[in-house]
């Protein structure tokens, strides 16, 4: 109780019907996520032709999504059953840390996948090809930096506290001290604004490169008096473009899922009167549900 902010005491208990609905939703998304990401990892690791440097990033994305739901899913089921957090203050902090860690690793893995597409499509032969060593270094960097940022609340830079609905835990966005808010400013920049800026930058040039390539192919085909050019280079470029579209779709779905979390943090800091327990719980539930999207999108590819 000492970890719960006074802001939440002004609200009555949530409608009891919310908990069964939330439990069913989490059961559905949890099973889909764990099964989908497990299959993704298994297929990529056991199919020799798929064990490429670029696909190491895909496997890392599936692993971070799997770990997120594996650690978030069971506690959420328990808290929904009991209508309150029953797992103690220590596990509350661990729960929030793991959620932040996996979310951060997921978005930065998507950023590196996007950057790899940018390198292949925009730079072409001038770009340095992704090697297994380089991909492994990227993955190590993702997890080290994500752990560094997410472990900070354990040392006093912000705190991990229960949400107002008492079914989950997260960062403290209601404290008004400069230290707590500075963490949210930096963390929002690190996990949302900077990745979004990099992603937009890469895709602007990817789209330009694809458009220029398609125009060049049409002009060349017109000069030759045929409908299209069906050579190996065109097929390869077309495959790369399809992969870029898949990556772009996945990134868009990720940002759609995690934007509510950003809004919750900033509304909590600057307009807390609009923040209710129901709003916070569904914001974070849909954020966790993004772990379901990625294996579906990559399975289609």
From Swiss-Prot:
Positions of disulphide bridges: 92-169
PROSITE patterns found in the cross-reference section: G_PROTEIN_RECEP_F1_1, G_PROTEIN_RECEP_F1_2, OPSIN
Short sequence motif named 'Ionic lock' involved in activated form stabilization, residue ranges: 116-118
Topological domain ranges for the Extracellular compartment: 1-18, 79-92, 156-182, 268-278
GO CC term, one of those recorded: cell projection
Membrane topology of this protein: Multi-pass membrane protein
Matching InterPro entries: GPCR_opsins (IPR050125), GPCR_Rhodpsn (IPR000276), GPCR_Rhodpsn_7TM (IPR017452), Opsin (IPR001760), Opsin_lateye (IPR001391), Retinal_BS (IPR027430)
Keyword Glycoprotein included in the entry's annotation: yes
Glycosylation sites: 165
GO biological process: phototransduction; visual perception
Assembly and interaction partners: Homodimer. Interacts with GNAQ.
Task of the protein: Photoreceptor required for image-forming vision at low light intensity. Can use both retinal and 3-dehydroretinal as visual pigment. Light-induced isomerization of 11-cis to all-trans retinal triggers a conformational change that activates signaling via G-proteins. Signaling via GNAQ probably mediates the activation of phospholipase C.
Protein's name in the database: Rhodopsin
Lineage: Eukaryota, Metazoa, Ecdysozoa, Arthropoda, Crustacea
Gene: RHO
């Amino acid at each position: 109780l000492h970890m719960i902010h006074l802001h939440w005491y002004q609200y009555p208990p949530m409608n009891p019907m919310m908990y069964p609905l939330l439990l069913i939703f989490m059961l559905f998304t949890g099973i889909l996520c764990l099964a989908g990401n497990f299959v993704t990892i298994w297929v990529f690791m056991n199919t020799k032709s798929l064990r490429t440097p670029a696909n190491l990033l895909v496997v890392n994305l599936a692993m971070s999504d799997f770990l997120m739901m594996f650690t978030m899913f069971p506690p959420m089921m328990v808290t929904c059953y009991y209508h309150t957090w029953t797992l103690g203050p220590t596990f509350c902090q661990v729960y929030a840390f793991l959620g932040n860690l996996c979310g951060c690793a997921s978005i930065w893995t998507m950023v590196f996948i996007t950057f790899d597409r940018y390198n292949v499509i925009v730079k072409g032969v001038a770009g340095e090809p992704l090697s297994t060593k380089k991909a492994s270094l990227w993955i190590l960097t993702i997890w080290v930096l994500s752990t560094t940022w997410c472990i900070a609340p354990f040392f006093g830079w912000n705190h991990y506290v229960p949400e107002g609905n008492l079914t989950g835990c997260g960062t403290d966005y209601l404290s008004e001290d400069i230290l707590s808010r500075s963490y949210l400013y930096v963390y929002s920049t690190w996990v949302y604004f900077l990745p979004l800026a990099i992603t937009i930058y890469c895709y602007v040039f990817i789209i330009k490169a694809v458009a220029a390539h398609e125009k060049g192919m049409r002009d060349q085909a017109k000069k030759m008096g045929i409908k299209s050019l069906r050579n190996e280079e065109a097929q390869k470029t077309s495959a790369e473009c399809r992969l870029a579209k898949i990556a772009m779709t996945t990134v868009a779905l990720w940002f759609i899922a995690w934007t509510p979390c950003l809004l919750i943090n900033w509304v909590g800091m600057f307009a807390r009167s609009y923040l209710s327990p129901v709003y916070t719980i569904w914001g974070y539930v849909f954020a966790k549900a993004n772990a379901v999207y990625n294996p579906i999108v990559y399975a289609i590819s």
